[in-house]
Amino acid sequence: MEFPKALIKRPNYHFEHPHKRKDKRIGRGFSIGELEKAGLNINNARKLGIIVDIRRKSVHEENVEVLKKFLEQLSNQKS
């Protein structure tokens, strides 16, 4: 089982062509707000191997859903 990756918005650059630009990119880790919405704290997330980006303040619902699915998969494997 692979660990989830966080998606974040890319910055807008004036020199990029809009049709070549991707809206999202893989981030450094999940924000604290995303972990809290998924029912985790920082210590438990790090014990599970989830990377935490403490500098990021944004909360993306896609990342919260990814974390919830990951936790469900973990609970299914344990039982």
Swiss-Prot record:
Highest taxon in the source lineage: Archaea
GO molecular function: structural constituent of ribosome
Annotated organism of origin: Saccharolobus islandicus (strain Y.N.15.51 / Yellowstone #2) (Sulfolobus islandicus)
HAMAP family cross-referenced by the UniProt entry: Ribosomal_eL13
Keyword tags: Ribonucleoprotein, Ribosomal protein
Official protein name in the record: Large ribosomal subunit protein eL13
Similarity remark: Belongs to the eukaryotic ribosomal protein eL13 family.
GO biological process: translation
NCBIfam families with a match to the protein in the record: PRK12277.1
GO cellular component, one term: ribonucleoprotein complex
Gene name for this UniProt entry: rpl13e
